């Protein structure tokens, strides 16, 4: 066992797929015998946009759109030799961004 700390950040627009991916990562890491903490839900980033419906006049008539970016954090406190192999062999669904820092 090494004392290398690995931090995994997951980002996505759909929180259900994000939670499934986090669970898949946690299960794969527990099979290797690594000590983990998480997944920790981080604050959701909400971007709001207002667009004028009409192309010419009527500024009073606007449409609002928003994009919600959900985030999860997983820390691997103690790794084993199989941990990195398990992380590289994972097949995560489309729509989930993963960022791994050593």
Swiss-Prot record:
Taxonomic superkingdom: Bacteria
Biological role: Involved in the binding of tRNA to the ribosomes.
One Pfam family per UniProt: Ribosomal_S10
Name under which the protein is recorded: Small ribosomal subunit protein uS10
Keywords for the protein's UniProt record, in alphabetical order: Ribonucleoprotein, Ribosomal protein
Family: Belongs to the universal ribosomal protein uS10 family.
SMART domains, per the entry: Ribosomal_S10
Record-level GO BP terms: translation
Any one Gene Ontology molecular-function term assigned to this protein's record: tRNA binding
Cellular component per GO, a single term: ribonucleoprotein complex
Gene3D superfamilies: Ribosomal protein S10 domain (3.30.70.600)
NCBIfam families cross-referenced by the UniProt entry: PRK00596.1 (NF001861), rpsJ_bact (TIGR01049)
């Amino acid at each position: 066992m090494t004392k290398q700390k690995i931090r995994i950040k997951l980002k996505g627009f759909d929180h259900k797929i994000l939670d499934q991916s986090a669970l898949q990562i946690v299960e794969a890491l527990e099979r290797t015998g690594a000590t983990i903490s998480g997944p920790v839900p981080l604050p959701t980033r909400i971007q709001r946009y207002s667009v004028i419906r009409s192309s010419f006049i009527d500024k009073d008539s606007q449409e609002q759109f928003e994009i919600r970016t959900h985030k999860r954090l997983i820390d691997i406190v103690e790794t084993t030799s199989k941990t990195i192999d398990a992380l590289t062999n994972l097949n995560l669904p489309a729509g989930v961004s993963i960022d791994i820092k050593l």
